[in-house]
């Protein structure tokens, strides 16, 4: 599982209301959610994000209320993965359940600039920064979690397993 994309940086304590404002929770349509993804944190994000881009954030990303809408919005916006110093535990679980790859890195936020291109190798646990000589390490995603992501989330994974 390898991703290359442009970095969008967000600070600490980005809550689920900043990821997808509550006023848009009347739909589960991924494209409708994508149109408003991160707009309270950066009003230009939904218009400027491109497929494959990567969100890099500070501590406690995804805190606040539990809602599956948040990882759905991020994924539907075209973001390939999210890397943060830390995640709220409920967001961490929801992200994998919805098939959104996420990684924790204590170092990346302070070493990368918004707009910089990075490559994330989730299998080997390496992040390469454009123009940097030294790679950063991350914890690789365990094989079972990689299966969830490859299948598009927990429900699709269970449906595939039940079909046998």
Curated annotation (Swiss-Prot):
Entry annotated with the keyword Lyase: yes
HAMAP family: LeuD_type2
Catalytic activity: (2R,3S)-3-isopropylmalate = (2S)-2-isopropylmalate
Enzyme class: lyase
Organism from which the protein derives: Syntrophus aciditrophicus (strain SB)
Keywords: Amino-acid biosynthesis, Branched-chain amino acid biosynthesis, Leucine biosynthesis, Lyase
Gene name, Swiss-Prot/TrEMBL: leuD
EC assignment: 4.2.1.33
One Pfam family hit: Aconitase_C
GO biological process, one term: L-leucine biosynthetic process
Matching SUPFAM superfamilies: LeuD/IlvD-like
Protein name (record): 3-isopropylmalate dehydratase small subunit
Functional description taken from the UniProt entry: Catalyzes the isomerization between 2-isopropylmalate and 3-isopropylmalate, via the formation of 2-isopropylmaleate.
Quaternary data: Heterodimer of LeuC and LeuD.
CDD domains according to UniProt: IPMI_Swivel
Segments forming a coiled coil: none
GO MF entries: 3-isopropylmalate dehydratase activity
Pathway as given in its UniProt record: Amino-acid biosynthesis; L-leucine biosynthesis; L-leucine from 3-methyl-2-oxobutanoate: step 2/4
């Amino acid at each position: 599982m390898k991703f290359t994309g442009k970095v969008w940086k967000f600070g600490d304590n980005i809550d689920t209301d900043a990821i997808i404002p509550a006023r848009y929770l009347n739909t589960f349509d991924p494209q409708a959610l994508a149109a408003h993804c991160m707009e309270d944190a950066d009003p230009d994000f939904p218009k400027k994000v491109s497929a494959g881009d990567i969100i890099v954030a500070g501590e406690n990303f995804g805190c606040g209320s539990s809602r599956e809408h948040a990882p759905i919005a991020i994924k539907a916006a075209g973001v390939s993965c999210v890397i943060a110093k830390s995640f709220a535990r409920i967001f961490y679980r929801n992200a994998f359940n919805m098939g959104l790859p996420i990684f924790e890195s204590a170092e990346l936020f302070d070493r990368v600039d918004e707009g910089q291109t990075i490559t994330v190798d989730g299998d080997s646990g390496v992040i390469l920064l454009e123009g940097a000589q030294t790679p950063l390490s991350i914890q690789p995603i365990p094989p079972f979690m990689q299966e969830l992501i490859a299948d598009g989330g927990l429900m699709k994974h269970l449906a595939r397993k039940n079909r046998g």
